[in-house]
Amino acid sequence: MLSRAGKVVCIGRNYAAHIRELNNPFPTKPFFFLKPTSAIVEPGHGNLIIPPDVSAHYEVELGLIMKDRLPARRPVSSNSWLDSIGAYFVGIDMTARNIQNEAKKKGLPWSFAKGYDTFLPVGPIIPKHLIPDPHNVILELSLNGKVVQKDSTSLMLNKIPKIFSSITEAMSLNPGDLVLTGTPKGVGPVVPGDILSARLLTAQEQEIIPSKFEIKAEKCD
C-alpha cells in the first residue's frame, strides 16, 4: 500500500510551462518538499476533502516507488537509477494555492499548503515493465470530463537521475519511499462536487493499464 510509504519527496518547478503559468522564477538548482503520508488517498479509500477557506489546485504527476535504497551522499550511477525504481503510479499533488502564495510572500516554507489530509490522491500501482522509459510517457488529468493537463514527461527539466542525485545530497531514499517528479502546465482550481480523473498514456497515446483513477472532491464537514 502506498500509504505505508516512509516518506513522499516531491520536486518543485520541474516543467517550464508550469513555471511560467504561475509566474514563478526558474530555480537555479532542483528543490524539494515533503508531503505527509496522511495526505495519501488510494483508489476506493475516500474522497478529496477541501477545507474551508482553501483554494485547492490540482497538479498531476508521475510517481516513483523505490525498490532499492539510495544512500545519502553517495553518487547515483547512470545504471543504478532505473534499477532502484520498483514501480510507478499517477498522483495528484493537491495544493492549497492561497496558503502557498501567502507563505511565498513571507519567505516561509509552504509544506503546510501541500500537507492537508487527502491532498495526495494516487492511482493503482503500475508494474515497472509497462513503462520501459519513464521519460517518454504522457500525463493526463481531466476535470469533470474535460482534459485540463496533458503533456509528456520528456519535458521534465530535471530528469530522474538528477532528481535522485539531488535528493540524496541530503537524505537517503529507502525501499517503499515515493518520489513525485513534477507537474506540467494546466493546473487549476478544484471545488466540492468536482470529479478528477488521471491516467498515464504511452507516447502513442494508448492508455497504460492500470493507471487510471477517479476521485470526487467534497467539502470538509
UniProtKB/Swiss-Prot annotation:
Keyword Membrane set for record: no
Keywords from the named record: Cytoplasm, Hydrolase, Isomerase, Magnesium, Metal-binding, Mitochondrion
GO cellular component: mitochondrion
Top-rank EC class of the record's enzyme: isomerase
Catalysed reactions, as listed in the record: oxaloacetate = enol-oxaloacetate
Primary subcellular site in the record, as a coarse category: mitochondrion
Organism: Schizosaccharomyces pombe (strain 972 / ATCC 24843)
Subcellular location(s) per record: Mitochondrion; Cytoplasm
Family classification: Belongs to the FAH family.
Purpose of the protein: Tautomerase that converts enol-oxaloacetate, a strong inhibitor of succinate dehydrogenase, to the physiological keto form of oxaloacetate.
Gene Ontology terms, MF aspect: acetylpyruvate hydrolase activity; acylpyruvate hydrolase activity; metal ion binding; oxaloacetate tautomerase activity
EC number(s) stated in the UniProt entry for this protein: 5.3.2.2
Any Pfam family hit: FAA_hydrolase
Cofactor note: Requires a divalent metal cation for activity.
GO BP terms: oxaloacetate metabolic process; tyrosine catabolic process
Cross-referenced InterPro entries: Fumarylacetoacetase-like_C (IPR011234), Fumarylacetoacetase_C_sf (IPR036663)
Cofactor(s) this protein cannot do without: Mg(2+); Mn(2+)
The keyword Amino-acid biosynthesis belongs to this UniProt entry's keyword annotation: no
Residues binding Mg(2+): E59, E61, D93
Designated name of the protein: Oxaloacetate tautomerase oaa1, mitochondrial
